[in-house]
Amino acid sequence: MSRRQTLKTLQKLILAPSQHISLSIASNLSVIPSRSMTTTATVPVLPTSIHDGLGKGIAYEKSLPRPVNPFSHRVPGREIITIPKFTLESGVEMRNVPVAYMSWGKLSSKANNVMIICHALSGSADVSDWWGPLLGHGKAFDTDKFFVICMNSLGSPYGTASPVTAKNGDYSEGWYGADFPSTTIRDDVRLHKLALDKLGVRKVAAAIGGSMGGMHVLEWAFFGKDYVRCIVPAATSSHQSAWAIGWGEAQRHAIRSDVKYKNGRYGFDDPPVLGLEAARMTALLTYRSRDSLERRFGRDTGSKKKTQKQESKTLPSNSTPIHSHSGADETPVAFDRADSSFAAQSYLRYQAKKFSNRFDSNCYIALTNKLDTHDLARGRTRTITEALSLIEQPTLVLGIRSDGLYTLAEQEQIARAVPNAKLREIVSDDGHDAFLIEWSQLNWLLIGFLHESLPDIMQRAAL
């Protein structure tokens, strides 16, 4: 088949509504079939690649039907609200913006018993996946009393608009990829507020979240106490520090250094896995403390397979965790250490490989860039202290002394400046990850605070 014939055949395939193929294209053109599409036509055999005069390769791949977002299957049960138009802080207007969410419990007749749970960097809307032991009857996230909801952030691969979703909700425009616009923590919260409006929510009883989720929680507070009654930011910051910005840049650099990254214009069939894995390894070291890793691995060389220990807690039997920071408390797995000298190396390699199977590099860059925009004072006040002083809600700040990423000192700053705040410590030497694994402490601290701040909800009968 000649070059001209090949191009004509491709054009017909793209334009013909009865023929559905997915195109994985290594330049600027990308097309993914919609969720409702099926492969009904006979697709002629195409060459694996053609080259234009500049030598840029374009690969075509016939595939079975798949959803617009190739990662959506990893969060079964999630629902989508579509916002027709949304203008980002940058001024960019997005259209047909999907917002993925999951909810538990019932919305009260007054629509005022909403508990927002905000996920961390690599999380999804499935709270049961990463804070499952806190969710359910009689627990902190009591589904008999609260309408518990978690909404996925912009840039995440798990359902909300991101580099792996269709541009403006239209698969014919291709997916965003590297063209996904810069978004902020405030963008997320404003978008999620629109989603709550669509659900008929009138008032938020509590907003709770850790790490990036804690940043969202602090931004929710600026809707005022008449809309958000109380907040719980955990292991977070009032602004992204130079320390955290530096770690994020090191991770992004690892991804961009992968030869397969191609300035973000890679296909789903051959992503920059090694760069993403290197970024994940770097991040994992910021999520744990030195003492935690030393206690767990030491200088164990494990010349034979050795079973990874669970640290002290177990996940629900039906849990398949994919979104915790370090995977510290997963079901035990065997490490094959034949190709490494130390257990710590096997741990990092295993976690990085697992992460690269369920995350996207452009999404990782988009989300870490989002963290760097976080600054409560931006556009509001001259100083962070002044911005924090504007928060009126009862506030429970949770900090971890061993956290080297978002330090206890940063939590103390928040608690000092917010007029109606108190600081409580999660006691652990596991570092930043403690907010995801010290479930019994979290449950006890949260229930106590909710009884103080929301007695009308906590003391009433189940809905």
Curated annotation (Swiss-Prot):
Fusaric acid is phytotoxic to plants such as cotton and banana. It has been shown to induce programmed cell death in plants. In addition to a mild toxicity to animals, fusaric acid exhibits acanthamoebicidal, antioomycete, and antimycobacterial activities. Induction: Expression is positively regulated by the secondary metabolism regulator LAE1. It is an enzyme of class 2 (transferase). Residues 296-331 are annotated as: Disordered. It holds the Pfam family Abhydrolase_1. Belongs to the AB hydrolase superfamily. MetX family. PANTHER family: HOMOSERINE O-ACETYLTRANSFERASE (PTHR32268:SF11). This is Homoserine O-acetyltransferase FUB5. It comes from Gibberella moniliformis (strain M3125 / FGSC 7600) (Maize ear and stalk rot fungus).
